[in-house]
Amino acid sequence: MGNKGYGFGAFKGVFTPSILTIIGVVMYLRFGWVLGNVGLLQSLIILTASTAITFLTGLSISALATNMRVKGGGAYFMISRSFGIEAGAAIGIPLFLSQAIAVAFYTTGFVEAFCDSIPFAEGWDVRHVSLVVLVAVLALTVFSADLALKAQYFIMAAIGLSLVSFFLGGAPDLATLKNVIPVSDLNNNDAALAIVESRSLGFWTVLAVFFPAVTGILSGVGMSGDLKNPSRSIPLGTIAAILVGYAVYASVVIFLDGFAGDSIQMRGALLEDQMFLAKCSRWTIPVIAGIWAACLSSALGSMLAAPRVLQALSHDGATPRFLGRGFGSNDDPRFAAALTFIIAAVVVYCGNI
């Protein structure tokens, strides 16, 4: 598989793509919904349980990374060298496909959020605009992973500003919020409570919806072939991303609960209004920019990781070998990236995602 690569460190190569996938669109658009369904205590239990599972996975990955010479392919490489290429391929191929399809989901999410936020973009065909964004993401990642990761620093700054705006915010005006409670019942607490209870989902359903939000560590692990010292960078970057992600999510849900208070009307708004977090914020624009950035960073992370998994599979003969061909001094997997793009484009054009 060669030893070519960019020579990234733990922060740039592992922590950055991992944390930007963990702090994603679910935090902005679905975390209020989680709180509205199960309350603060159970939200923290869901967050802790989900993070604990990811943390144990991170420890396992770290143990593998420190006990072998890690090359390109991330989780696939480590599994295949521990349990055999056949077992590795059985996991690596679905992993590649899931990351390629995720590029389509994140790109479409970015375009929908953009079109909903910008008046002149109303009416644009989401599929066509998504294809344009896909081309831009492909161009950024296929010619220079270094440039793509540098772009993620700006995305990280946008997400940081959105969090500052949120933490400086306060309780939103109930009149500006969408609500599961009809206007006629807003002042009738008994009727409002009955409506909210009928619309609320249980602990396990909410856990199933939220859990994928904190599993973004494979974006960083997938950069293993481009790390200067994978045995050090993978454990350090992965565990740091998990812990920072937990701290951010815990802080956000505690502040959300404080802003919403004990009002049943606010709980109804948490269930219905996806922009509740933005409407709590001191300034709305940084949060909208944060939502765009979260979608775009996740698309970039998946577009960086997926081709490298496919490249490693091809080097092992599990997929056609021409897909593993690398270009330039850094062994960029352009053929694998092209296939990733094609899969993502097909999913985008299927529509309704």
Describe each region flagged by the PLM.
Residues 43, 121-125, 157-288:
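Helix-loop-helix junctions that connect adjacent transmembrane segments
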